[in-house]
Amino acid sequence: MNRLIFLTFTCLLWASAAAAELRLEVDLSERRLDAVVDGEVVESFVVAVGKNGNPTPEGAFKIRKVIWNPAWKPPDAKWARGKSAKPPGHPDNPMKIVKMFFKEPDYYIHGTGDEDSLGQAESHGCIRMHEQDVTRLAQLVMEHGGKPMPEPWYRRIFRRKTTKVVYLHAPVPIEIRG
């Protein structure tokens, strides 16, 4: 009986979170990412966007997965020549703690150690965020994407420094406009 009550309660919580639709809106000219739930901005973040020659793609996309403690492999691009791969948790890993693909394989939202770049057009096309902000955003995306996790799960992820890919039950829409 207790198990049935717990399962029912868990399903109701998931349905409640899923019913409140999250969408992300990125304004490239304002260098801002808004998290919008049921038409209301619930979080607003300053971001870095693509610079001249490496613009952030515009359009409507979906986030289908969240990757915690991602490794970084230099892309096959001129700017990345001579750079070496960085494992999860490495201080020089430009992805930092989490990344969320919006246009695979090369464009994602991720943390940055270069906080001076926030509010600027400084990236190679990705959307960079402060580490605390991107962590909060990834938690929102997982919650509204049907994969909420308890706080101890996140503590383990941060402590272990191993890559964990979370596929969302419900992709989260993101619109990027100039």
Task: Label the model's feature ranges.
Residues 58, 77-178:
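Exported/periplasmic cell-wall-interacting domains
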Residues 19-64, 68-69, 150-178:
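Intrinsically disordered, low-complexity
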Residues 5-14:
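Bacterial N-terminal signal peptides
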Residues 70-71, 116:
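Short, acidic Gly/Pro/Ser/Thr-rich loop/turn segments
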Residues 69-70, 106:
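Short, charged/polar surface micro-motifs in flexible loops or helix N-caps
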Residues 71-77:
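Short acidic, Gly/Pro-enriched loop/turn segments at secondary-structure junctions
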